[in-house]
Amino acid sequence: MAFRIDKLTTQAQNVVAEAQAQATSAGNAEIDPLHVLSAAVNQRDGITTPLLEKINVDVPKLKSLLTSELEKLPHASGMGQARVSAKLQAALEASATSAESLKDEYVSTEHLLVGLARTDNKAKNLLSLLGVSDNDLLTAMSQIRGSARVTDPNAESTYQALEKFGIDLTQLAQSGKLDPVIGRDNEIRRVIQVLSRRTKNNPVLIGQPGVGKTAIAEGLALRIFEGDVPQSLKGKKVVSLDMGALVAGAKFRGDFEERLKSVLREVKDSDGKVILFIDELHLVVGAGNAEGSADAANLLKPELARGALRCIGATTLDEYRQHIEKDAALERRFQPVFVGEPNVEDTVAILRGLKPRYESHHGVRITDSALVAAANLSDRYIADRFLPDKAIDLIDEAASRLAMEKESVPEPIDRLQRRLRQLELVHRQLVDEQEASAVDKRVEVEEEMESAKAELASLKEQWETEKMGLDDVQSVRQEVDQLQHRFAQLDADAKEKQLRGESPEDAYSEMLQVQSRLRELQARIDEAEKHDDSADQTKEEPGDEKRRLLRKEVTEEEIAEVVSTWTGVPVTRMMETERAKLLVMEERLHQRVVGQDEAVTAVSDAVRRSRSGLQDPNRPIGSFLFLGPTGVGKTELCKALAEVMFDDESAMVRIDMSEFMERHSVSRLIGAPPGYVGYEEGGKLTEAVRRRPYAVILLDEMEKAHPDVFNVLLQVLDDGRLTDGQGRTVNFTNTVVVMTSNVGSQVIQRVTEEGGGEDEMRQAVEDALKARFLPEFLNRIDDTVIFHPLQQTQIRRIVQLQLEELRSRLAANGLSFEITDAAIDQIAEVGYDPAYGARPLKRVIQREVQNPLASAILKNSYAEGTTIKIDHDGDQFVFSG
C-alpha cells in the first residue's frame, strides 16, 4: 500500500524530520531505519523510551549501539537532501498496516517502532539483539495506551495521562516522602465511608486554609500503603491531579478537554484501582472554559454521578460557597466532609508526630517545650492563620535558623572579623606617619590586632569542632529516618503475606535486624546529646566565658523569637535588663513628661501587667481616656510610651479624630464596604494594626469625631478585635489604646483656680463626659486619667528639657552653651499661660534664644568649641562666649 505522510501524528512527523536532518548532516545519501530509530529514542517527552523501558530494554545501551551503527553507514561530503531508502519505505508501510489493524486513524511513533521491528533492516537487528520483537512492542503499547485509539495528530500527548498530569501519593508514601498524619481519624474514616459507596462516592474536604485538608488525602495514601484500610481499598492508588500541568501548554481549543478526558479514561480503565484527588477543587470549575467549550466540571459530572470515577476534592469554605455551591449539579455529586481547625492539644500531638522529620531535615534537636510553645504562641499571637499550619511553620523556621548558623559565620566571629578589617585599614594609613602620636596609635592598633587574631583563631577552632559534631548527629538522624521507613515497609509486607496465607518469616527476620540497628543509632544520638548537655553545663559555670557558638536544640525561647519577628510582639522571655527597665518605667517616662503622676502610673501598670503575662488575653493591653487642658502632656505621654516600648517615638498609630467629623467617615477607619470605591484599600485603623500588631494607638481629640465613630470602638475596647470592611478580624489585644480629649478642660481649669479638691474635679469632669460620650463607651475604658494644669515649678523643668534639645542641635555645629537660673526663670515666666499649657514655651525659646543664636552663627561670631553663656540682665537676654 502507498504510504501517506499526512497520516503521521505530529510526534511521528517530528521523528521522520529529525531522521532526515541526521542523515543529511552526516552526509548519508539515504534515510535509513537506523536514523528513524535513533530520532525516536532521543525524542524528548516522546513515547519511545517509556515503551522500551516497559519491556526492560537497556535504553542507554541501545543509544550507544545506534551511534556505532550509524557511523558505519556510507557517507560523503557535499551530498544534497537525503532521500528515503527502500527499507525505510517498507518499514513505513508496515507501520501504516499496524495502525490500520488497530483501528487507528493516524500512524503514531509506536507504530513506526512496530514497522521497524516487522521488516528486514538493521534497526530490527539491533532490537532483536536486545530481545525486542514486534509482539513485545504491541503488548507494551496496549499497557500504555489502554483503551485509547489514535484519532488525532496529537494522540501521544494523551498517553500515560495519569503519569504526566498526576502525582501518585501512594508511591510517595511507599518511598517515605510523605509526612506522617497524626489525628484526623474521624475525617479519614468518613472519607473511606464515602469512597466505599456504590454511587456518588466522592468526598470533598472543606475547611479553612492550613487546617490539613491535603494531609487527609496523604493520610489515606499512607494507610493504603500500610494496609490499614478496608478490603475494598487495599491495593488502590491515590493520584493527585496536577491542574497546572493539565492546563500548561494547552494552546488550542479542545487541548485541555482532550487531556482531561484521557485522565478520566485511564481512571475508569483502572477498574476502581485509582482514586483521583483534586486539590483546590474550585479551580476545576471554569478551567479550560472558553466560548463554545465545556469547562472541566461539565466533563467530570457524568463520571461522578455514575460512580465510575472515585474522586476526593479539597477546597476552602469560601471557595466552596463561591464556586461549587453555585453549580447545584456538581455540588450534589460530592459529599462534604468538614475539616475543622484542631485545638491546641491536638496541634501539640500533630507536632510531636512531625518532630522526627524536622529534626532529621535540619539536623537539630527540638524540645517538647518548643512544640507546646509553638502551638500556644501561634494560637494567641498569629490571628489571621489557622492551626496546625502556623504552628508547623514556627517549628520549621526556628529549626532553620539554628541550621543556618552551621553554614554561616556565628555572630561573635563575624563581629571580630569586621573589627579586624577596620583595624587593618587604620594600620595601613598609619604606617608611613612619623609623628609621635601616630606612632603610639600604630603600636596600640598592632597590639589590638594581635589580640583580635588570637581570639578569632580560637573561636574558629571552637566553631569547627562544634559543627563537626552537629554534622555527625544529623547523618545519624537521617539514617534513623530511613530505617524507620524501611521498618514500616517490612511491616506492611508481612501483613500482606499473612493475608495471602504465605509465610512472613523473611520480613520478620529483616525487621529484627532493622530494629537492632535502630536501637544502636538511637543510643548514639542519646550519648551525643548527653555529652552536649554536660559540656554546656560546664561552659556556663560562673567565671568561664567560653560558651557555645552553635545552638543544638530548638527551645521555647527560639519559638518566641520567631513569633516576635513575625508579629513585632515581644513574647521572648524577659532579660534582667528589661525587667529592671519595666520596674522603673515611671522614671523613664518622667524624663520626657513633667508632672502628671497619675497618668504615668496608670500607663506603666498596664504595660507591666502585659509583659508579666497577667493581662486578659481578650482585651487590649490598656485603654485610657486622657482628659485635660491643651499643652499639659497628653500627646507627649503617648510619644514617650512609644519610645519606652519600641525605642522609637514614631512607632505609634496616630489618628486625628478631627478628620472623622461626618457620619460616613467611619468607613475610613475600617475600610469601605463591598461595592464602594476604596473597598480594596482597607481601613486606616485596621490596616495599621494588621501591619503592626504591637503598637500604641493614639486617637487624638476624640470629642471632635462624630458620635457614630465611638460605636466602632466598642468591640476594640471590650473584645480586643475589630472586623474590617473585607470581613477580616483584626486583633487589638497587643495594643495600648489612648484617646485624648479636651472635654471638661474648662472645668478642670476652674476647679484648679478655685483650689477645689481632687474628688470635686473628678465629679465635675465625669458629668461633662456623660453629657458628651455614650455610657457603653465610657464603661469599656480601663481608666479615665485627668491631666492637671501645669504649675510654675513644672514649667521650669519643661524649659530645661526643651533647652537640652537645643543643646544637642548646637553640638552638631561644635558649640555648647550654659544658661543661668535667671534666664531659665525669665523664659518660664514669659512662656507660662495656664490656659495654653507648655506650648507657648517653644515660641519664647525660639524668639528669645534661637533667633539671636542663629544670627550669631551665620556671622561666625563664635569659633568652634566655644561655650556660649546665656544670661538675663533684667531687661533682655545676654549672649557671651
From Swiss-Prot:
Oligomeric and partner information = Homohexamer. The oligomerization is ATP-dependent.
Transmembrane stretches, by residue range?
none
Provide the species name: Rhodopirellula baltica (strain DSM 10527 / NCIMB 13988 / SH1)
Its cellular-component GO annotations read: cytoplasm
Q: Where is this region: NBD1?
A: 160-341
What name does UniProt use for this protein? Chaperone protein ClpB
User: Belongs to which family?
Assistant: Belongs to the ClpA/ClpB family.
- Spell out the residue ranges making up region: NBD2: 578-789
Chain intervals for the UniProt region annotation (C-terminal): 790-881
Q: Name the coiled-coil region(s).
A: 392-530
InterPro entries xref list = AAA+_ATPase, ATPase_AAA_core, Chaperonin_ClpB, Clp_ATPase_C, Clp_N_dom_sf, Clp_R_dom, ClpA/B, ClpA/B_CS1
Residues reported in the UniProt entry to bind ATP 2: 628-635
Gene3D superfamilies on file: 1.10.8.60, Clp, N-terminal domain, P-loop containing nucleotide triphosphate hydrolases
What domain notes does the record hold?
The Clp repeat (R) domain probably functions as a substrate-discriminating domain, recruiting aggregated proteins to the ClpB hexamer and/or stabilizing bound proteins. The NBD2 domain is responsible for oligomerization, whereas the NBD1 domain stabilizes the hexamer probably in an ATP-dependent manner. The movement of the coiled-coil domain is essential for ClpB ability to rescue proteins from an aggregated state, probably by pulling apart large aggregated proteins, which are bound between the coiled-coils motifs of adjacent ClpB subunits in the functional hexamer.
Q: Name one Pfam family in it.
A: AAA_2
Region annotated Disordered sits at 528-548
